[in-house]
């Protein structure tokens, strides 16, 4: 196992979706970490209208995605539920670093995302947050890393380290930041701004058209296919959000 990610997992402020040693070993098996996306450069967002506007036809796998919004980004997480559902087939960690809230278990279960794949890390400082994010991305044990950088100021060089880590990995890296950073330059491969409910603006994308606005469907959780497959669970979580505050 990668020593850095092992250190992160062993921290007292890290939570795993299961305490089973067997399940953890299964997820951290690096032998098959690159088997699902060996040559892919992107993964579908799960929204045809958004994929059509992105240069690679989805979220870039070799580069960071920066998501800006006016709140703490918790409501933005529904945007990534379809991708998380797809990545769950890899049986690797889906890692949350510095998240202001915890995943709403009934909802992720309704989406078919195993809770034992969820790894939450709670850094105490910005330096720990940056370090944990880079190490998680560079390891081969995470299919996706969500990192909440918030409204703090980050140097271009600090963000570039994360971008380079993502460029050398098949791990999807999503960085959440405040809209206050909109005027700051960024080295990421894709930058989007969520300025209203389900309204996304593509601010920057390498090799593609920018300043593109997309209105997404109301909620991917309630499409006809999922409703038919998970009718009871969907009904029970219609009013829930993807994330709930940490107790």
Residue map of PLM features:
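Detector for small/aliphatic-rich hydrophobic stretches
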Residues: 1-96, 208, 237-247
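Conserved inter-motif catalytic segment of the P-loop NTP-binding fold
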Residues: 38, 91-146
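Helical mechanochemical/support elements of P-loop NTPase systems and associated helical scaffolds
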Residues: 46, 76, 104, 129, ...
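Short acidic, S/G/P-rich loop/turn micro-motifs used as interaction or catalytic elements
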Residues: 71-74, 125-126, 150-155
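A short acidic, amphipathic alpha-helical/loop segment
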Residues: 79-83, 107, 132, 158-162
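Hydrophobic/aromatic ligand-binding patch that stacks against planar heteroaromatic rings
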Residues: 86, 136, 165
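A contiguous pocket-lining binding segment that forms or flanks enzyme active sites
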Residues: 140-183
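Phosphate-binding/switch region of NTP-binding enzymes
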Residues: 175-245
């Amino acid at each position: 196992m990668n020593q850095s990610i092992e250190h992160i997992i062993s921290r007292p402020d890290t939570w795993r979706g299961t305490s089973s040693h067997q399940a953890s070993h299964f997820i951290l098996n690096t032998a098959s970490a690159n088997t699902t996306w060996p040559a892919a450069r992107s993964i579908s967002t799960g929204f045809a209208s958004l994929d059509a506007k992105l240069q690679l036809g989805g979220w870039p796998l070799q580069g960071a995605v920066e998501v800006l919004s006016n709140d703490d980004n918790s409501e933005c997480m529904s945007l990534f539920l379809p991708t998380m559902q797809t990545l769950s087939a890899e049986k690797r960690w889906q890692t949350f670093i510095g998240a202001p809230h915890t995943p709403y278990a009934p909802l992720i279960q309704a989406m078919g995302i195993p809770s034992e794949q969820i790894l939450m890390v709670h850094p105490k400082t910005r330096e720990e947050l940056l370090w944990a994010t880079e190490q998680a991305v560079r390891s081969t044990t995470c299919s996706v890393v969500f990192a909440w950088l918030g409204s703090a100021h980050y140097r271009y060089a600090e963000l570039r380290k994360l971008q380079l880590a993502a460029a050398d990995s098949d791990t999807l890296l999503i960085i959440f930041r405040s809209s206050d950073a909109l005027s700051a330059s960024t080295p990421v491969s894709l930058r989007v701004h969520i300025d209203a409910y389900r309204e996304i603006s593509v601010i920057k994308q390498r090799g593609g058209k920018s300043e593109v606005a997309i209105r997404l469907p109301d909620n991917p959780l309630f499409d006809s296919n999922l409703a038919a497959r998970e009718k009871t669970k969907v009904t029970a979580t219609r009013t829930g959000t993807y994330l709930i505050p940490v107790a």
